[in-house]
């Protein structure tokens, strides 16, 4: 499925006259396909799907991707997962893929399982505070690469003290989307 999505994405971008920028994780997908491990529908992918019993991680993945000698801090991994998804959501808002912050929040929770306790990706950014979020993304980008770089629109919004949701009137609470 991932391969089909990639090929369609490339075709769509070319049709729009845009350039496709490959992601570093694509080499993993390509390698898995070379190993004839196309996924659950094929009966094997990152996981083994025995007819009897529970699925389990395919041990062969460690042949090319062995565990690192030094494992990252769990809290840092959690932060990276939350922040990179929030940054991508801001990009989607900037590009018009989604037009309403509430739609982005609901979609992130119900669509792909972003943690509900955050209120959604954009609510997470607002809870952290836009300036603090941008500063932390700058730190993450310096440590882990450009996927954490925030769009200029978010940096500008943070500098102006703006938010994604309007502030409630005095004495009122923001209602749920």
Language model segments and positions:
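N-terminal glycine-rich phosphate-binding loop for ADP-containing cofactors
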Residues: 1-177
């Amino acid at each position: 499925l991932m391969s089909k999505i990639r090929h369609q994405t490339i075709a769509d971008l070319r049709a729009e006259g845009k350039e496709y920028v490959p992601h570093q994780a694509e080499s993993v997908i390509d390698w898995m396909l070379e190993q004839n491990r196309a996924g659950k529908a094929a009966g094997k992918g990152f996981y083994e799907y025995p007819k009897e019993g529970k699925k389990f991680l395919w041990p062969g993945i460690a042949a090319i991707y062995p565990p690192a000698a030094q494992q990252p801090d769990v809290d840092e991994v959690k932060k990276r997962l939350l922040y990179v998804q929030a940054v991508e959501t801001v990009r989607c808002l900037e590009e018009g893929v989604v037009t309403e912050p509430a739609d982005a929040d609901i979609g992130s929770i119900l669509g792909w399982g972003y943690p509900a306790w955050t209120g959604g990706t954009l609510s997470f950014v607002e809870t952290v505070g836009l300036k603090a979020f941008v500063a932390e993304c700058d730190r993450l980008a310096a440590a882990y690469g450009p996927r954490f770089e925030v769009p200029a629109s978010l940096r500008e919004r943070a500098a102006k003290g703006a938010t994604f949701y309007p502030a409630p009137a005095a004495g009122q609470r923001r209602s749920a989307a």
